[in-house]
UniProtKB/Swiss-Prot annotation:
[4Fe-4S] cluster binds at residues 143, 147, 150. This is Probable dual-specificity RNA methyltransferase RlmN. One of its GO terms (molecular function) is rRNA (adenine(2503)-C2-)-methyltransferase activity. Keywords: 4Fe-4S, Cytoplasm, Disulfide bond, Iron, Iron-sulfur, Metal-binding, Methyltransferase, rRNA processing, S-adenosyl-L-methionine, Transferase, tRNA processing. Reaction proceeds by a ping-pong mechanism involving intermediate methylation of a conserved cysteine residue. Disulfide bonds join 136-377. The keyword 4Fe-4S applies. The keyword Iron applies. The gene is rlmN. It comes from the Bacteria. Its cofactor is [4Fe-4S] cluster. It comes from Bifidobacterium adolescentis (strain ATCC 15703 / DSM 20083 / NCTC 11814 / E194a). S-adenosyl-L-methionine binds at residues 198-199, 232, 255-257, 334.
């Protein structure tokens, strides 16, 4: 496996040109410590052999990690006492360290700021609902997509995250739910959305490895159904097509935000590389391959993309491909510090939804959890609080 951070795709220069980010460039400034979640089975067995441990100990470690969310030596009760610390240090180096934890919505929304091995900061958001618990996770440090209304997009891309760094966000949240650390008592982490910091398709190899580990049953993974995992993208077409070939029934979410190329060029710089037709073609092909409805994410911005003409054009573009293949999630824009972009008027939000519904498009206005702790969509900026 050895899924250490690979290359990504990021805007380059002021002309809108794009380039691949090489591993020696700023997207990979150093490798995190190799973690159990980064290793192939052969690498795990090899590491165990170096420690003088028999092969069957690897399966025991997998059961501890994926089945019980344990990484601490004292929890390895089935290991010889003298070997527990060695095993924990070799297989489970600390990849993410909690810096701050902010709580909102009566304790049912928790935003955590994490420090990585190199001092980089990322965030994840855990949201408990009556019938499910969703974790929004990061896949890159920062983001190179440059969307002007998104706090993460203003950071630029520092580097890709390893599979281990991604998976650890899930393990810690799953353990917190099991241990009753979230308001509502003990429960189960049920849904994962790759909608935190970063463009998941720009870190494809690590994200795919994480998806496999999240969705596989213990002791190979956490056992969260692939159907409850959402992978988002601003429209990196090669990534969408590659994901369709994997045969993993995750939901695809496309951050469209505009129905025309003229407007989307301004809101989503990646549109200069992959235009709306290319993105929607790929998204529809993903629907055909996966039999999963695609989510179309659409941040509503006052006077920019929230008028009747925009809703009508969006409906026309989606209906071009047929019925019931996409579900639109209009999202009230979440404010970010110093931004000129503001949320739509409630009456414009209602009219936008009504037009989509009348055109036969399924659409649901997105619940904006964690806005008061800058934990909602587009607000993750990984800042330490004063």
């Amino acid at each position: 496996m050895n899924d250490q951070p690979e290359t990504g795709i990021t805007p380059g220069g002021t002309s809108g040109a794009f380039r691949d980010v090489l591993s020696k460039d700023h997207a990979r400034r150093g490798k995190p410590p190799l973690h159990f979640a980064d290793m192939s089975e052969e690498e795990r067995i090899g590491k165990a052999k170096e420690l003088g441990l028999p092969k069957f100990r690897v399966k025991q470690l997998a059961n501890h990690y994926y089945g019980h969310f344990d990484v601490n030596a004292e929890e390895f009760s089935d290991f010889p006492a003298a070997r527990r610390s060695d095993a924990a240090e070799a297989f489970f180096p600390e990849l993410i360290h909690e810096v701050t934890r902010q709580v909102a919505d009566g304790g049912t929304t928790i935003k955590t700021l994490w420090r990585l091995f190199d001092g980089s900061l990322i965030e994840s958001v855990l949201m408990r609902y009556p019938t499910r618990t969703t974790l929004c996770i990061s896949s890159q440090v920062g983001c190179g997509m440059g969307c002007p209304f998104c706090a993460t997009g203003q950071l630029g891309l520092t580097r890709n995250m390893s599979a281990g760094e991604i998976v650890e966000q899930v393990r810690v949240a799953a353990k917190a739910m099991r241990d009753g650390e979230v308001a509502g008592g003990s429960g189960r982490l049920s849904n994962i959305v790759f909608m935190g910091m970063g463009e998941p398709m720009g870190n494809y190899k690590s994200v795919l490895s994480a998806v496999r580990q999240i969705s596989s049953m213990p002791p190979e993974g956490f056992g969260i159904s692939a159907r409850n995992i959402t992978v988002s993208t601003v429209g990196v077409v090669p990534g969408i097509r590659k994901l369709a070939e994997e045969g993993i029934p995750v939901r695809l979410a496309v951050s469209l935000h505009a129905p025309s190329d003229e407007l989307r060029d301004e809101l989503v710089p990646m549109n200069k590389r992959f235009n709306t037709k290319q993105v929607l073609d790929a998204a529809h092909d993903y629907y055909l391959a996966s039999k999963r409805r695609v989510s179309i994410e659409y941040a509503l911005m006052r006077g920019i993309n929230d008028q009747a003409e925009h809703a009508k054009l969006l409906a026309k573009r989606l209906n071009h491909y047929g019925d019931d293949w996409a579900h639109v999630n209009p999202i009230p824009l979440n404010p970010i510090e110093g931004s000129k972009w503001t949320a739509s008027k409630p009456e414009d939000e209602r009219r936008f939804l009504e037009i989509l519904h009348n055109a036969g498009i399924t659409a649901t206005l997105r619940d904006t959890r964690g806005q008061d702790i800058d934990g909602a969509c587009g607000q993750l900026a990984a800042k330490e609080r004063d």
